[in-house]
Amino acid sequence: MSIKGIEQPEYIEIDKKIRLRKFDGKYDFAFEWYQDTDTLWMLDGDKEPYTLELLDKMYTWWNQAGEVYFIEVLEDEIYKSIGDVSFKQDDMPILIGDKNYRKKGIATKVVRKLIERGKELGYKELEIEEIYSWNLDSQKLYTNLGFKPFKETKNGMSYKLIL
C-alpha cells in the first residue's frame, strides 16, 4: 500500500549490485529467513520460528503501515532476494536473511538510502521503535548512521535521527 499519499517506487537502486524491490505479495522465498532462532532473537526477542500465517500477517501489516522492500543483490546477472526492510517515519526494521550477506555493509547502504528517502519525503526525523539491548549489531548500524537513543523501552531503546 505504501505511505499515505506517497507513491512507493518499484525499485530503489542502492548501488550497481544492490537494489530494493517493492513488496509484491510474494514472499515464499523469505520463509526460511524467519526460521533461524538466533536471527529471531535479535529481531523479535523470541526464538519461535514463524509460521506461514505469521509471516503473512507481518508482511500484510507492514505493507499497510508503510513501505516494504526486498533487498536484492545482483549475482550472475540475476537479482537474488537476501533480506527485507520496512520503512515508515517511526520505524525501519531490516533483516539480512541470507547469512552469507551479513557483515558486508549491505544493511548500512540500505538504511543510508532510506534516510535519503525520508529527507526527500520532507521528514524532519526518523525513529526506530526498539532495538533490543542484546542486539549490538543493530545498535551499531543505526548509531553509526547518526541515530541516537532517546527513550528506554521494555527490552532496549528507541532511536531517533534528526534530518
Task: Kindly give the residue locations of the regions a language model identified.
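A short, well-structured alpha-helix characteristic of acyl/acetyltransferase catalytic modules
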Residues: 1-57
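A short helix-loop-beta-strand connector motif used in the catalytic cores of GNAT acetyltransferases and
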Residues: 58-71
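Conserved beta-strand in the GNAT
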Residues: 70, 78-91
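A short, internal acetyl-CoA/4′-phosphopantetheine-binding micro-motif in the GNAT/acyltransferase core
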Residues: 72, 91-106, 131-132
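Conserved acetyl-CoA-binding loop-helix of GNAT-fold acetyltransferases
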Residues: 103-117, 139-144
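Short acidic/polar active-site loop segments enriched in Thr and Asp
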Residues: 124, 129, 148
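Conserved beta-strand-loop-alpha-helix junction that forms the acyl-donor binding cleft
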Residues: 128-139
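Conserved acetyl-CoA-binding loop of GNAT-fold acetyltransferases
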Residues: 143-153
